[in-house]
Structure formats: structure tokens, C-alpha cells
A protein has these predicted regions:
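Acidic/polar low-complexity flexible segments
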Residues: 2, 58-65, 73-79, 136-179
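Short amphipathic beta-strand and strand-loop transition segments with alternating hydrophobic
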Residues: 22-28, 109-117
Length: 179
């Protein structure tokens, strides 16, 4: 088990929210991934939807505030994208290679996670049992990111690292956590 804290950085060209801090913590315990996102700062400047009574699998969650996770097995081109809405909605996509062969991952029919909000802190916690998609002895490259929508309608892109001229969470060179 290794517990790894990280701080996400806004994409340089985006209209960053200077007082917002997005930290993450990721742990792999056997074949369970434990991920926690913490947003601190002026949350009143962000569009954070309230928790839905009926969280569901949905597409295009990144058009609003969305917390994201990318998992790629070492020595392989394929990877998974996890999208998590503060409203409780979610989706998991599998890609054969960089942005190619996208399909919803059928191994998951639900993805429960916990959200909590206080005046200046929002937290999302998730445990993913990965046995359905990845063997326990498989090493992973992981990318953690977020799309944050402001009350002014602007979307900002946050990630562990930005390696291109445009924000692109799918780039394998941004999957910098080794688990």
C-alpha cells in the first residue's frame, strides 16, 4: 500500500481561479484504488451541482465540473477514463489507444462515491475495486485531473502536469503516478 498526495495545477492558458486549491490523495491497497479529491478556496465562485437523489451513468460530464482519473496498465496502449460529477453522476470509458476505440466500460454498472461540502471545502472520495478490469499484479500509470466550471461559465482544466500546448488529460505522459 502506498499513500500518495498530489496537488493539481491549472492549465497555463486557462482563466485560473487563483485562490482555488485542488489536492488529491491516491492509494492502491491490493487491487483497490482509493482516491480522494479536495477542493479548497472560494467555492462560491464554482459551479458545484448538488448531490442527485438518483446518481446515474452519464456522458459528457466534463462539460461541467468533473473530477477525472486515468488508469493505464504499464507496457500497454489501452487505458480507462473515470468521470465523476459532484452530483454523483459518473462514467467509465475504455480506450484501445490514445483517444481511439472509446467505449463505455461494461464491467461497472455503478460507481458509488462520497461527496461532502462545507463553506470553503468540497471533498469527493472513491474506492474502486479493480478486479473486474486489471489484475492485482499489474502496475499502473495514473493521471488525475479535473474540469472546474466557474459561475461565469468558464471551464478550467487542472492536472498533475500539462505537457502539451492544449489541455489534454489523455496524453500518456501525464499519467505520472506509478502504482
Amino acid at each position: 500500500m502506498n499513500n500518495r498526495p498530489f496537488l493539481l495545477k491549472p492549465f497555463p492558458a486557462s482563466a485560473a481561479l487563483p485562490d482555488l486549491k485542488i489536492s488529491t490523495n491516491i492509494t492502491r491497497r491490493f487491487n483497490t484504488l482509493i482516491v480522494q479529491y479536495n477542493l479548497t478556496g472560494p467555492l462560491e465562485e464554482l459551479v458545484i451541482p448538488t448531490l442527485s437523489d438518483r446518481p446515474a451513468r452519464k456522458n459528457n460530464l466534463w462539460e461541467e465540473t468533473c473530477l477525472e482519473l486515468f488508469l493505464g496498465p504499464d507496457n500497454s496502449d489501452h487505458y480507462w477514463e473515470f468521470n465523476l460529477s459532484p452530483a454523483g453522476h459518473w462514467n467509465i470509458y475504455h480506450f484501445r489507444s490514445y483517444r481511439k476505440g472509446i467505449r463505455e466500460e461494461p464491467a461497472f454498472t455503478s460507481l458509488p462515491f462520497i461527496v461532502s461540502r462545507q463553506e470553503d471545502t468540497f471533498q469527493l472520495s472513491l474506492e474502486i475495486g479493480m478486479d473486474k478490469i486489471i489484475p492485482a499484479d499489474q502496475s499502473l500509470a495514473v493521471g488525475v485531473s479535473a474540469v472546474i466550471k466557474s459561475i461565469y461559465g468558464e471551464l478550467t482544466c487542472w492536472a498533475l502536469i500539462h505537457t502539451g500546448t492544449e489541455a489534454d488529460f489523455h496524453r500518456r505522459d501525464t499519467f505520472i503516478i506509478e502504482l
